Amino acid sequence: PPGSLEELVHDRDGPRIIIQDPRTSTPGLGLLLWMRKVFGTDDQAAWTALAPRIVTVTKGWSEAYGLFLKGEAPMVLSYTTSPAYHRQVEQNNRYQVAMFSEGHYRQVEVAARLSTSSEPQLAQNFLRFLLSDTVQNILPTTNWMLPSVHTGQGLPDAFRDEEVPERMLQFDSLEVRDQRKQWISRWLTALSR
């Protein structure tokens, strides 16, 4: 696999890839932000360079990963924790993460209490429950993600072999809020050429 996002984008003979739409998918949005973080204002040119090897852009992760598992492309935008699922559930070590030298964009699943909630205390209690050891200990093998907080239990064996990105990339949330529409527009323009 490619060793960097730069290599993935600019290697004309590189692997074909399935990605998700940043308008409908948080991993797709993560890729959009990742490209912007690595390539800056050259992101549109990077998307144009990658476009010929994009097999399809799916609405969500499930559709993309399903196509990948059916052999539609040798590479898919997924989570660094995806191989743990295959190791634990299928006893299959075939699937690997492509670690990129520039770093990886941080994917965070969120839960929040709305200011307009009619049950603010119930919502707060639920958020506390989500952060409890009970829930955090089951997340790795139910949602196949790393927990938000460390618990005394540690991670299941399937995660012990996981490669962890050395560098995590992330934009300030206010910048994403202010620039997202423009960045998506640039993505649409690049992929429609």
Cite the ranges covered by each PLM segment.
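Periplasmic-binding protein-like
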Residues: 15-24, 47-51, 57-58, 90-115, 129-153
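Extracytoplasmic ligand-binding site segments that recognize negatively charged/polar headgroups
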Residues: 1-73, 86
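A ligand-binding cleft/hinge motif common to bilobed small-molecule-binding domains
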Residues: 69, 73-94, 143-144
